[in-house]
Each structure stands twice: as structure tokens, then as C-alpha cells.
């Protein structure tokens, strides 16, 4: 039985007019999704530990030291973005920094999960998995037929800025349940758009040595989509 393109490295073009080697592009895609899968497994593991070991969220949410630790962990991914980009092509430093980045995000996600019921977290996780899988398959299918989603970039970036501003405003002026649910719904649509956009970029635009950048982008897309869906279901 003949193997599929994904298994063999791809004999067919990923998109019309493809001039590069499809085998090299498929190798890049496999490497990227292997890294992303490891990141997601680490996130599930760390989040599960934080969720089920109740002294951890209690320390974070009920003590001043815990809040300070959580604030540092929230800032850590932002601080790590520079070394991630600076050492992107320097192995194994890039993998070490990426691991720390993933662990810090995972801990933050675990704290967010600990504030919700287990059933709600599970529903959000299942919805996220279904949407990510569906959007990824759709993007590969659409790109194969000549569609290009690069035009989404400016619109998604503008929407992301609005989301960041609203998130900061909620710190000082918390939204009601209905407003918070609407906000989470809009955010989930934006991050669905980002999954399509970033998948399009990894198929057509990114260089073969930019797998760290691609992994970070897709990982953040998935995590933000999960947190947005968690916000919808929680409300």
C-alpha cells in the first residue's frame, strides 16, 4: 500500500506553483509539529500537577508571596522572547530557552485551570483540540487549492492589540459575566484566525531554520484559544 505524502515526506506540491522541494518543506512541517506536540504534552502535565496539587494554587492565590511568584512567572515569557529570537538558530540554547518558556506558560495555564471546575477545563480542552485539528486540516486543504491567508495578518494584529488593551482594562475595571463571555468569544475567533494564518505561513513563507519561531507562534495560538474557550464556558 502506498504511503501518504505526510508519511513519505510529500511527493506532491503543497500549493500551486511551489518552487521549493516538497520533501524539505514536509520535513520542516514534521519537525515543527513534533516540537509543538512536546510543548502541549508538557503543558498538560504541568497543568495537571498544578490543578490536582491544591497547595500550589492556594499558595499562589491566597498569599502575597504567591502572587509575587505568579507575577514573575507571567512576565517570564515576555522576557524570554528576546533570547528566543536571538538564539533561535543556536542549538541547544534555543531548545533550553524554549523549554523554560513552555514551562512558564504551562504553570500560568495550570493556575487558570485551577480556578475552574474540572468538567469545564475538560470541555475547553476538547473544544480546543477539535478546533485546532479542524482548522489545521482546513488550512492545508485550502492552501493546496491555491488559497493564501497572508492577508489576515494586519487585521489579526489590530484585533490582538484591542484584546490586549481590554485585558489590561479588566484589571482595573472588571467586566460583568455577559461582557466577559462576549469578550472571550471574540478573542477565540481572533485566535482561530491566527491558527489559520500561522499555519499558512509555515506552509508557504517560513524558512526551514525558523522552526522555533513557528512553534512559539502556534503554541501561543493554541494556549490563547484554550483560555478564551475556558472563559466562555466558565461564564
Swiss-Prot record:
Protein's membrane topology: Multi-pass membrane protein
Pfam families in alphabetical order: Bax1-I
Tissue specificity remark: Expressed at very low in leaves.
Keyword Isomerase: no
Transmembrane annotation, as ranges: 33-53, 67-87, 95-115, 120-140, 149-169, 178-198, 212-232
Entries under InterPro entries matching the protein: Bax_inhibitor_1-related
Protein's cellular compartments: Membrane
UniProt keywords, alphabetically: Membrane, Plant defense, Transmembrane, Transmembrane helix
Disruption phenotype: Delayed development of the powdery mildew fungus E.cruciferarum. Increased cell death upon A.alternata f.sp. lycopersici (AAL) toxin treatment.
Transmembrane among keywords: yes
Gene Ontology CC, one term: membrane
Predominant subcellular localization, coarse grouping: membrane
Family membership: Belongs to the BI1 family.
Function: (Microbial infection) Facilitates the development of the powdery mildew fungus E.cruciferarum. (Microbial infection) May prevent cell death upon A.alternata f.sp. lycopersici (AAL) toxin treatment.
Record's protein name: Protein LIFEGUARD 1
Provenance organism: Arabidopsis thaliana
Gene this protein is translated from: LFG1
Amino acid at each position: 500500500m502506498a504511503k501518504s505524502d505526510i508519511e513519505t515526506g510529500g511527493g506532491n506540491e503543497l500549493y500551486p506553483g511551489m518552487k521549493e522541494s516538497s520533501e524539505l518543506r514536509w520535513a520542516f512541517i514534521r519537525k515543527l509539529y513534533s516540537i509543538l506536540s512536546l510543548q502541549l504534552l508538557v503543558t498538560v502535565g504541568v497543568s495537571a500537577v498544578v490543578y490536582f496539587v491544591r497547595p500550589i494554587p492556594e499558595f499562589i492565590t491566597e498569599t502575597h508571596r504567591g502572587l509575587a511568584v505568579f507575577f514573575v512567572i507571567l512576565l517570564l515569557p515576555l522576557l524570554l522572547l528576546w533570547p528566543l529570537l536571538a538564539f533561535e538558530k543556536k542549538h541547544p540554547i534555543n531548545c533550553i530557552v524554549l523549554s523554560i518558556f513552555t514551562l512558564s506558560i504551562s504553570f500560568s495555564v495550570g493556575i487558570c485551570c485551577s480556578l475552574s471546575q474540572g468538567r469545564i477545563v475538560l470541555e475547553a480542552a476538547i473544544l480546543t483540540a477539535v478546533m485546532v485539528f479542524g482548522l489545521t486540516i482546513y488550512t492545508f486543504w485550502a492552501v493546496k487549492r491555491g488559497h493564501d491567508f497572508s492577508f489576515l495578518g494586519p487585521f489579526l494584529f489590530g484585533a490582538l492589540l484591542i484584546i490586549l488593551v481590554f485585558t489590561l482594562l479588566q484589571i482595573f475595571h472588571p467586566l460583568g459575566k455577559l461582557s466577559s463571555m462576549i469578550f472571550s468569544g471574540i478573542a477565540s475567533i481572533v485566535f482561530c484566525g491566527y491558527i489559520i494564518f500561522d499555519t499558512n505561513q509555515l506552509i508557504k513563507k517560513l524558512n526551514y531554520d525558523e522552526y522555533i519561531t513557528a512553534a512559539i507562534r502556534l503554541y501561543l495560538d493554541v494556549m490563547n484559544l484554550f483560555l478564551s474557550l475556558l472563559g466562555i464556558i466558565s461564564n
